[in-house]
Amino acid sequence: MEKREEITKRMKIILEKMKNTEKEKVREMERSYEQTWDVAVAGGGVSGTAAAIAAARCGARVLILEQNGYLGGTLTGCGVGPMMTFHAGETQVIKGIMEEIVQRLVKRGYSAGHVHDTTRYISYLTPFSAEGLKLILDEMTEEAGCEVLFHTFIGEVE
């Protein structure tokens, strides 16, 4: 009986050491991921991604937190398209990074560019390949130096 109690006691000590070791490993992992950014963007939809690219191009250290495994939000993941708000009548009013995205899509064959809408619902629309847009957004965020965390939900901000 004494031998059994001694073995049990030793096993408890070993298990406690293992538990402490695992806790320390977790703490070490948490410490290794402690970083700071100038800008954190909640959501890598097209607007969030464009904002992140703009901030990174201005020299900010940028982190995009995206719940899906891709950038572009509903434009790339939900079949929302074509893009339709670049023009007010015949005047193009949306330019900048969004126009750069369209030009890259056109150059790679993922879009025909801004096309006159013959139904007169809107003046121009911009059809595109959702998979092509995902690729372009990935490339542009990488070029700008943005860091992206996919499959990430925001639970708390300090």
Annotate each language-model stretch with its function.
Residues 48:
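N-terminal Rossmann-fold NAD(P) dinucleotide-binding loop
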Residues 33-45:
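Beta1/beta-strand and adjacent pyrophosphate-binding region of the FAD-binding site
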